[in-house]
């Protein structure tokens, strides 16, 4: 009898642990981590000081705001997630979380994220967070994703807003500096997403999501990736020319951008297993991380040298 009770208790503990993990997965933690990082850099680049407690609340609100959008996205896309290999293990598809529970979780976390941002930080940051959640769910997920070949180009607005929210959380303004951070992510999104679509092309075909390689073909998509990579190279240098960073940033970001262009160009010589597309996809993640980290470090050096 004691062994049976122990077994039941262990099952309850394991179920509880898996549920917590599943709710974390529901919020798309990989995407959330990049959102938090770019938001935090936006906060650090703002030319104002903020109390660490307020800054912490802002970061938590943005994290849960992003998580709520991810949860509602999984709720809405549960039908096509079951058809794609890379999304078949998501919590709703596996039955770990019921669709209604996921929707409720997303709505509640989103509401409290926006509410506490308004209550503890400022109304501008709260409005931008609300707009970002709305845009990702309604404009991208519901309207564009299954209808337009430009889904991630237009839909990328929501993914590019976190540093603007972070900047606004500290300064209560939107400036040229935060707009440039926005543009870097906005232009980075198409080559990043289309590289993924190149090696997941069959998945997108199966679920009938009109990604660029699926509708226009791989060659056309590769040309578009190269164009956007060139635009990204130009935009990534802008922080130097508006006095947001120093010469070190110009040199290193230029090198990182040239490597990005190299990987984009190598797509035209890709193998059937899409090896180069996978390399570009992975590199693009590291690229964005290092560009934002470099911006923060060189901006800090510039600020110290001007004192």
Swiss-Prot record:
Q: How does it sit in the membrane?
A: Multi-pass membrane protein
Q: Which Pfam families match?
A: UbiA (PF01040)
> Molecular function terms in GO for this entry?
protoheme IX farnesyltransferase activity
Task: Name the domain of life.
Answer: Bacteria
- Annotated metabolic or biological route of this protein: Porphyrin-containing compound metabolism; heme O biosynthesis; heme O from protoheme: step 1/1
What CDD domains does the record tag this protein with? PT_UbiA_Cox10
- Which segments cross the bilayer? 31-51, 52-72, 102-119, 123-145, 151-171, 179-199, 225-245, 247-267, 281-301
User: Its Enzyme Commission number?
Assistant: 2.5.1.141
User: Gene Ontology cellular component?
Assistant: plasma membrane
- Give the record's keywords alphabetically: Cell inner membrane, Cell membrane, Heme biosynthesis, Membrane, Transferase, Transmembrane, Transmembrane helix
The record's top EC class is: transferase
Biological processes annotated in GO: heme O biosynthetic process
Q: Where in the cell is it found?
A: Cell inner membrane
According to UniProt, the reaction catalysed is:
heme b + (2E,6E)-farnesyl diphosphate + H2O = Fe(II)-heme o + diphosphate
Q: InterPro entries annotated for this entry?
A: Protohaem_IX_farnesylTrfase (IPR006369), UbiA_prenyltransferase (IPR000537), UbiA_prenylTrfase_CS (IPR030470), UbiA_sf (IPR044878)
The family assignment reads: Belongs to the UbiA prenyltransferase family. Protoheme IX farnesyltransferase subfamily.
What does the record's miscellaneous section state? Carbon 2 of the heme B porphyrin ring is defined according to the Fischer nomenclature.
Q: What does this protein do?
A: Converts heme B (protoheme IX) to heme O by substitution of the vinyl group on carbon 2 of heme B porphyrin ring with a hydroxyethyl farnesyl side group.
Entry protein name: Protoheme IX farnesyltransferase
| Species of provenance | Rickettsia canadensis (strain McKiel)
Gene behind this protein: ctaB
């Amino acid at each position: 009898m004691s062994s049976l009770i122990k077994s039941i208790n262990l099952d309850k503990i394991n179920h509880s642990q898996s549920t917590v993990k599943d709710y974390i997965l529901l919020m798309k933690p990989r995407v959330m981590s990049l959102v938090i990082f770019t938001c935090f850099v936006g906060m650090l680049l703002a030319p104002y000081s903020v109390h660490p407690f307020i800054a912490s609340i802002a970061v938590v609100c943005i994290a849960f705001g992003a998580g709520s959008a991810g949860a509602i996205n999984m709720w809405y896309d549960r039908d096509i997630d079951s058809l794609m290999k890379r999304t078949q293990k998501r919590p709703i598809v596996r039955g770990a979380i019921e669709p209604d529970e996921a929707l409720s979780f997303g709505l509640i976390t989103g509401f409290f994220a926006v509410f506490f941002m308004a209550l503890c930080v400022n109304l501008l940051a709260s409005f931008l967070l609300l707009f970002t959640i709305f845009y990702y769910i309604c404009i991208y997920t519901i309207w564009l994703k299954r209808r337009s070949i430009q889904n991630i180009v237009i839909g990328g607005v929501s993914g590019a807003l976190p540093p603007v929210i972070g900047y606004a959380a500290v300064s209560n303004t939107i400036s040229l500096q935060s707009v440039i951070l926005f543009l870097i992510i906005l232009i980075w999104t198409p080559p990043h997403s289309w590289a993924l679509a190149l090696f997941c092309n069959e998945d997108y075909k199966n679920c009938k999501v009109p990604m660029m390689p699926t509708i226009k073909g791989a060659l056309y998509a590769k040309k578009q990736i190269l164009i956007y990579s060139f635009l990204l190279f130009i935009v990534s240098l802008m922080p130097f020319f508006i006095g947001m960073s120093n010469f070190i940033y110009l040199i290193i970001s230029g090198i990182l951008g040239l490597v990005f262009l190299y990987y984009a160009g190598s797509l035209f010589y890709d193998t059937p297993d899409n090896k180069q597309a996978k390399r570009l996809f992975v590199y693009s993640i590291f690229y964005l991380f290092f560009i934002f980290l470099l911006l923060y470090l060189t901006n800090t050096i510039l600020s110290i040298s001007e004192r």
